[in-house]
């Protein structure tokens, strides 16, 4: 069955996903150039991500959408199990948002330039001033009423377990007094583990759990600590038992 699934990926999925990636990138760039970035910066990527999951026949379960208020901006924070985190959140969260992502992703052919035109935020860690500029852009996105999705671990897990959370997303939420909404991703590590059989996906169900947002309790260090600790705890408790427990990743 494993080899039949790989043949299906090669013969059916690969051509369709390559074409879809080109069309999505072109639609995003042209749509944003023509002015409606709110629509074109989100929906082509959303349906492209949905297609990735569906064409690979991966079952998806989403829990907790009832926790989200329609007109509220959130700082979403999620564990980073694998490459399919992107497709699961983008395709199934059901919320218009911007990503905070590594600067290196700008170099991905077509996808990188589409993300730039969609005004997703590339985090440049080459120096303090560059990091500050990245967070200034994120601040403006949130001030405009958009939500933001961040992986506070900063890198995909090598084990499926959670690593250390960085404070940046929580500092932004504190500054603008926004709720932080934890997201737990299950199954992504099993579908596409980091640095293993890079050319193939494995069949495994995916699950996205949207936890109850954590409202600010004030402003400053205590609020940052509260939102960060409660987010970490909620995400950890939502993980499958085999992936619960802290493991520090070497590139964090």
Outline where the language-model segments fall.
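A generic structural signal for well-ordered alpha-helical segments
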Residues: 52-53, 115, 141, 173
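Generic preference for hydrophobic
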Residues: 62, 76, 99-100, 208-210
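Catalytic core of membrane glycerolipid acyltransferases/transacylases, capturing the structured
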Residues: 24-43, 55, 70-128
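Thr-Gly-centered strand-to-loop micro-motif
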Residues: 63, 100-102, 124-125, 152, ...
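Short glycine/serine/threonine/alanine-rich loop segments
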Residues: 58, 120, 178
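Membrane-anchoring hydrophobic helices of lipid-metabolizing enzymes
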Residues: 1-74
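Non-catalytic C-terminal accessory region of glycerolipid acyltransferases
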Residues: 4, 132-252
